[in-house]
Design a protein with these regions (language model features):
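Basic, amphipathic alpha-helical patches used to engage nucleic acids or provide basic targeting signals
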Residues: 10-14, 41-109
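Solvent-exposed, charged helical/coil patches
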Residues: 1-32, 81, 112-114
Length: 114
């Protein structure tokens, strides 16, 4: 299966946390355009604002496993090397405090304007 096929599948079957965050992002609460399940290099990122070079990742439970932590750190560094800022949230953070998550994203976007 090709990367673009995986991205399309991920769009069709988002996690509850991804779905909730997308509902808020899509409603333009952040005043910038985001894409979801977007391919950057060899990666599919959950959300990206190309204009601001900001990637948002929403991590499920398996991201706390040692091997996955190492992969995530490498991936984050690779994205940073390409000029992107990366914010990671746990599923439970998005589901339990969507206002707090949106505020962190807004703060990051505002810092990019300075």
């Amino acid at each position: 299966m090709l990367l673009k096929d995986f991205a399309q599948t991920n769009k069709q079957f988002p996690t509850d946390a991804e779905k909730l965050l997308w509902e808020h992002i899509r409603a333009k609460q952040l005043s910038v355009k985001f894409n979801r399940q977007h391919i950057i290099g060899d990666y599919i990122v959950d959300f990206v604002c190309i204009e601001k070079k900001l990637v948002i990742e929403v991590d499920g439970g398996y991201h706390s496993e040692y091997e996955q932590i190492e992969k995530d750190e490498f991936r984050t560094q690779q994205l940073r090397d390409w000029g992107f800022s990366v914010i990671r949230f746990k599923n439970e953070d998005v589901l339990g405090d969507i206002s707090g998550v949106l505020n962190k994203i807004k703060n990051n976007l505002n810092n990019k304007n300075e």
